[in-house]
UniProtKB/Swiss-Prot annotation:
This is Phosphoglucosamine mutase. Mg(2+) binds at residues 99, 242, 244, 246. The keyword Cytoplasm does not apply. The modification Phosphoserine is found at residue 99. It is an enzyme of class 5 (isomerase). The gene is glmM. Its EC number is 5.4.2.10. Activated by phosphorylation. The keyword Isomerase applies. Keywords: Isomerase, Magnesium, Metal-binding, Phosphoprotein. It catalyses: alpha-D-glucosamine 1-phosphate = D-glucosamine 6-phosphate. GO terms for cellular component: cytosol. The active site is at residue 99. Its cofactor is Mg(2+).
Length: 445
């Protein structure tokens, strides 16, 4: 049985991800990190889901039972956990979140002592430990060696300082009216504080988490309400975060939702113009063809990798690069953070607007993405795509019509993601119907 997906362990809280799994997974991870232990402390944070309390208590029980001390810091963005794990000299960090998923899902992500997400090899080792009953039993310590847990509520200041340090010292946000949609999630305190302290006029939306409303018709996956509010208030820009604030969606002053690849393109050019861009930009295989064209036009190379911000970071390390991201809004400025950070990306875009003295729409309009259609199709089983009869012929036919394709399974759900890209939207709509019917028969038959 495989536990880890694209981004940690994720599933329906109380069913797949119950307290037993959380406790045993924490023990397995703790056993793995014991060999590298320096401080014997592990940091645990979460987003605002009600199930986070159940999972957090189970994780604390598992870790303390094998002798670890646990530092609990409450609701905090995923990138904050990555930063604070290293900043507070912990052996590892754990984030309890299902990111952009609905409240009834939850997840567990791990970070090493340096704030990096774990490689697939390490995740595999933790899975092996998880299923080793003898090793799990043998790891339990005597009564006097059981670990302690303590809750610290004031670490938010450390993260805020680190975020503000990413913003140019010679700029201020005083001239900007900004609308923030924090998705009733982990950034509901941090995001408004950062923007207010840097001088912006801030209007906040979806900042009243009740444990059940995270991501509900708000945030990065549902930016329509933010777009309407930006127009109504005549704001300069709107920023929408997801439940754990590791992704960003930008809305311009006209209420138009920016394409994620347009955002990547203009931020990459901004870094280059400052002389800060190192090596090539990294995006995923789902990136728009227009991004590559835009970057190449400005003398910037683009490399691609699998979907997931940890793969973007891995590729950046190999290339010696410092900027990359995903169309979905995960944007990595590795000079400032080791994972996608929506707040850092929002501040960098704000700095770009201020330094150019241009509107959000005029900046984002530099990159004109080709039409793409993405369909998430629920499926009964995940067959090997290379062995599906007729798929090669289907892809060849689409290629002959100048349609780019990407078909991939979700790492966390029973879905196949079907992506088509071409210059003719009507052709895409027609062909997507055929593609959906093909996969319905192939995977639900």
């Amino acid at each position: 049985m495989k536990l880890f997906g694209t981004d940690g362990v994720r599933g329906k809280a109380g069913e797949f991800l119950d307290s037993f799994l959380a406790m045993r997974l924490a023990m397995a991870a703790g056993i793995y990190f014991k060999d590298k232990s320096i401080t014997n402390n592990i940091l645990v944070g979460k987003d605002t889901r009600r199930s986070g309390y159940m999972i957090e208590n189970a994780i604390v029980s598992g870790l303390t039972s094998i002798g670890y001390n646990v530092i609990q810091i409450g609701p905090m963005p995923t990138p904050a956990i990555a930063f604070l794990t290293e900043d507070m000299r912990c052996d590892a960090g754990i984030m309890i979140s299902a990111s952009h998923n609905p409240y009834y899902d939850n997840g567990i992500k791990f970070f090493d002592a340096h704030g990096n997400k774990l490689s697939e090899d390490i995740e595999k080792k933790i899975e092996e430990i998880y299923f080793d009953d003898k090793l799990i039993q043998a790891s339990k310590v005597d009564m006097e060696k059981i670990g302690q847990a303590k809750r610290i509520d004031d670490v938010i200041g450390r993260y805020i300082v680190s975020i503000k340090n990413s913003f140019p010292k010679d700029l201020t946000l005083k001239s900007l009216r900004v609308v923030l949609d924090v998705a009733h999630g982990a950034a509901y305190k941090v995001a408004p504080t950062v923007f207010k302290e840097l001088g912006a006029e801030v209007i906040v939306m979806s900042d009243k988490p009740n444990g059940l409303n995270i991501n509900e018709n708000c945030g990065a996956l549902h930016p329509a309400n933010l777009a309407a509010e930006v127009k109504r208030l005549r704001a300069d820009v709107g920023f929408a975060f997801d439940g754990d604030a590791d992704r960003l969606v930008v809305v311009d002053e006209k209420g138009e939702v920016a394409n994620g690849d347009s955002l990547l393109g203009v931020l990459a050019l901004y870094l280059k113009e400052q002389g800060k861009l190192q090596s090539s930009v990294v995006a995923t295989i789902m990136s728009n063809g227009a991004l590559k064209e835009f970057l190449n036009k400005h003398g910037i190379e683009l490399d691609t990798c699998n979907v997931g911000d940890k793969y973007v970071l891995e590729k950046l390390k190999v290339n010696g690069g410092n900027f990359g991201g995903e169309q979905s809004g995960h944007i990595i400025f590795s000079d400032y953070a080791k994972t996608g950070d929506g707040l850092i990306a929002a501040l960098q875009f704000s700095a770009l607007m201020l330094s150019k003295k241009k509107s959000a729409s005029s900046i984002l309009g530099q990159v004109k993405p080709y039409p793409q259609l993405l369909t998430n199709l629920k499926i009964a089983e995940k067959k090997d795509l290379d062995k599906i009869k007729g798929l090669k012929e289907l892809k060849k036919d689409l290629e002959n019509k100048n349609i780019n394709t990407l078909f991939r399974y979700s790492g966390t759900e029973n879905l196949i993601r079907l992506l088509l890209e071409a210059k003719d939207i009507k052709l895409l709509e027609k062909e997507m119907k055929n593609v959906v019917e093909f996969f319905k028969k192939a995977l639900n038959g």
